[in-house]
Design a protein with these regions (language model features):
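Fe-S-dependent hydro-lyases/dehydratases of central metabolism
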Residues: 1-173
Length: 173
Protein backbone atom coordinates (compact mmCIF):
# COMPACT_ATOMS: atom_id res chain seq x y z
CA UNK A 1 0.00 0.00 0.00
CA UNK A 2 1.36 3.39 -0.96
CA UNK A 3 -0.41 6.35 0.58
CA UNK A 4 -0.04 10.03 -0.08
CA UNK A 5 -0.94 12.89 2.20
CA UNK A 6 -4.14 13.42 0.21
CA UNK A 7 -5.19 9.75 0.16
CA UNK A 8 -8.56 9.04 1.75
CA UNK A 9 -8.55 5.82 3.73
CA UNK A 10 -12.01 5.34 5.18
CA UNK A 11 -11.55 1.61 5.66
CA UNK A 12 -9.13 -1.29 5.30
CA UNK A 13 -10.51 -4.63 4.12
CA UNK A 14 -8.93 -8.06 4.08
CA UNK A 15 -7.96 -11.04 6.13
CA UNK A 16 -6.33 -10.64 9.55
CA UNK A 17 -3.16 -12.03 11.11
CA UNK A 18 -3.22 -12.55 14.90
CA UNK A 19 0.11 -11.72 16.55
CA UNK A 20 0.33 -12.49 20.26
CA UNK A 21 2.60 -10.82 22.79
CA UNK A 22 2.99 -7.58 24.70
CA UNK A 23 5.83 -5.11 24.18
CA UNK A 24 6.73 -6.23 20.67
CA UNK A 25 9.39 -3.68 19.87
CA UNK A 26 10.73 -2.26 16.63
CA UNK A 27 13.87 -4.43 16.90
CA UNK A 28 11.65 -7.50 16.74
CA UNK A 29 9.53 -6.07 13.94
CA UNK A 30 12.61 -5.35 11.81
CA UNK A 31 16.07 -6.27 13.16
CA UNK A 32 18.71 -3.53 13.18
CA UNK A 33 20.87 -5.17 10.50
CA UNK A 34 18.19 -4.29 7.93
CA UNK A 35 18.33 -0.56 8.73
CA UNK A 36 21.26 0.04 6.39
CA UNK A 37 19.12 -0.20 3.28
CA UNK A 38 19.02 2.85 1.03
CA UNK A 39 15.35 2.26 0.19
CA UNK A 40 12.62 0.44 2.07
CA UNK A 41 12.11 -2.00 -0.81
CA UNK A 42 12.45 -5.60 0.31
CA UNK A 43 11.90 -4.90 4.01
CA UNK A 44 8.61 -6.82 4.02
CA UNK A 45 10.29 -10.18 3.64
CA UNK A 46 12.35 -9.44 6.77
CA UNK A 47 9.47 -8.46 9.08
CA UNK A 48 9.94 -10.38 12.34
CA UNK A 49 13.02 -12.06 10.80
CA UNK A 50 14.68 -13.03 14.09
CA UNK A 51 11.44 -14.21 15.70
CA UNK A 52 10.65 -16.26 12.61
CA UNK A 53 14.12 -17.86 12.48
CA UNK A 54 14.10 -18.52 16.22
CA UNK A 55 10.80 -20.36 16.03
CA UNK A 56 11.85 -22.27 12.90
CA UNK A 57 14.98 -23.47 14.73
CA UNK A 58 12.66 -25.00 17.34
CA UNK A 59 10.44 -26.58 14.70
CA UNK A 60 7.70 -23.99 15.20
CA UNK A 61 6.17 -21.59 12.71
CA UNK A 62 5.75 -17.84 13.20
CA UNK A 63 2.31 -16.52 12.31
CA UNK A 64 3.86 -14.44 9.48
CA UNK A 65 5.12 -17.70 7.92
CA UNK A 66 1.87 -19.65 8.18
CA UNK A 67 0.31 -20.12 4.72
CA UNK A 68 -3.18 -19.33 5.98
CA UNK A 69 -2.13 -15.79 6.94
CA UNK A 70 -0.22 -14.90 3.77
CA UNK A 71 -1.83 -11.89 2.14
CA UNK A 72 -3.46 -10.67 5.36
CA UNK A 73 -4.06 -6.90 5.41
CA UNK A 74 -4.95 -6.31 9.07
CA UNK A 75 -2.72 -7.08 12.06
CA UNK A 76 -4.16 -7.85 15.51
CA UNK A 77 -1.58 -7.18 18.25
CA UNK A 78 -1.41 -6.74 22.02
CA UNK A 79 -0.11 -4.05 24.40
CA UNK A 80 2.58 -1.48 23.63
CA UNK A 81 3.02 -2.60 20.04
CA UNK A 82 5.95 -0.94 18.28
CA UNK A 83 7.82 0.15 21.41
CA UNK A 84 11.59 0.64 21.34
CA UNK A 85 13.58 2.76 18.94
CA UNK A 86 11.81 5.24 16.69
CA UNK A 87 12.74 3.68 13.37
CA UNK A 88 10.40 4.20 10.44
CA UNK A 89 11.68 0.88 9.10
CA UNK A 90 9.32 -1.03 11.43
CA UNK A 91 6.02 0.21 9.98
CA UNK A 92 7.64 0.23 6.52
CA UNK A 93 8.41 -3.49 6.86
CA UNK A 94 4.85 -4.26 7.96
CA UNK A 95 3.43 -2.20 5.10
CA UNK A 96 5.71 -3.93 2.60
CA UNK A 97 4.69 -7.34 4.01
CA UNK A 98 1.12 -6.30 3.16
CA UNK A 99 -0.28 -4.88 6.39
CA UNK A 100 -2.63 -1.94 5.76
CA UNK A 101 -4.16 -1.54 9.24
CA UNK A 102 -3.24 -2.47 12.82
CA UNK A 103 -5.49 -3.06 15.81
CA UNK A 104 -3.84 -3.41 19.21
CA UNK A 105 -4.44 -2.86 22.90
CA UNK A 106 -1.99 0.04 22.78
CA UNK A 107 0.81 1.45 20.64
CA UNK A 108 4.13 3.14 21.24
CA UNK A 109 3.54 6.79 20.38
CA UNK A 110 6.27 7.21 17.74
CA UNK A 111 5.38 3.92 16.04
CA UNK A 112 1.74 5.01 15.93
CA UNK A 113 2.74 8.34 14.36
CA UNK A 114 4.97 6.65 11.79
CA UNK A 115 2.11 4.33 10.80
CA UNK A 116 -0.28 7.25 10.39
CA UNK A 117 2.31 9.09 8.27
CA UNK A 118 2.53 6.04 6.00
CA UNK A 119 -1.24 5.74 5.67
CA UNK A 120 -1.63 2.76 8.00
CA UNK A 121 -4.62 3.27 10.31
CA UNK A 122 -4.01 2.14 13.89
CA UNK A 123 -6.93 1.44 16.20
CA UNK A 124 -7.10 0.53 19.88
CA UNK A 125 -9.30 -2.04 21.60
CA UNK A 126 -9.28 -3.37 25.15
CA UNK A 127 -7.72 -6.64 26.27
CA UNK A 128 -10.97 -8.62 26.13
CA UNK A 129 -11.72 -7.38 22.60
CA UNK A 130 -8.25 -8.21 21.26
CA UNK A 131 -8.64 -11.67 22.77
CA UNK A 132 -11.89 -12.13 20.87
CA UNK A 133 -10.34 -10.78 17.65
CA UNK A 134 -7.33 -13.10 17.97
CA UNK A 135 -9.63 -16.09 18.58
CA UNK A 136 -11.85 -15.24 15.60
CA UNK A 137 -8.86 -14.81 13.26
CA UNK A 138 -7.40 -18.12 14.45
CA UNK A 139 -10.71 -19.94 14.09
CA UNK A 140 -11.20 -18.72 10.52
CA UNK A 141 -8.01 -17.40 8.88
CA UNK A 142 -9.94 -16.84 5.63
CA UNK A 143 -12.49 -14.53 7.22
CA UNK A 144 -12.77 -11.09 5.69
CA UNK A 145 -12.50 -8.11 8.04
CA UNK A 146 -13.18 -4.41 7.60
CA UNK A 147 -11.47 -1.83 9.76
CA UNK A 148 -13.91 1.05 9.30
CA UNK A 149 -11.96 4.20 10.17
CA UNK A 150 -15.00 6.42 9.66
CA UNK A 151 -17.36 4.37 11.88
CA UNK A 152 -14.59 3.36 14.33
CA UNK A 153 -15.39 -0.34 14.22
CA UNK A 154 -13.80 -3.62 13.11
CA UNK A 155 -16.26 -5.97 11.39
CA UNK A 156 -15.77 -9.60 10.46
CA UNK A 157 -16.97 -12.80 12.08
CA UNK A 158 -17.40 -10.55 15.13
CA UNK A 159 -17.76 -6.79 15.46
CA UNK A 160 -15.90 -4.63 17.96
CA UNK A 161 -15.78 -0.88 18.47
CA UNK A 162 -12.29 0.61 18.09
CA UNK A 163 -10.74 3.84 19.30
CA UNK A 164 -8.98 6.03 16.77
CA UNK A 165 -7.95 9.50 17.98
CA UNK A 166 -9.71 12.36 16.19
CA UNK A 167 -6.50 13.88 14.75
CA UNK A 168 -5.17 10.77 13.00
CA UNK A 169 -8.69 9.76 11.99
CA UNK A 170 -9.24 13.12 10.27
CA UNK A 171 -5.97 12.65 8.35
CA UNK A 172 -7.39 9.48 6.79
CA UNK A 173 -10.80 10.91 6.02
Amino acid sequence: MQATAAAVISSVSGRAVPLHGNDIDTDRIIPARFLRCVTFDGLGEHAFEDDRRGLAAKGEVHVFDKPEYQGAKILFANKNFGCGSSREHAPQSLMRWGIEGVIAESFAEIFFGNCVSLGIPCAVVDEAAIGRLHAAAEKDPNAEWVLDVDARVIRGPITEPVAIPDGPRSQFL
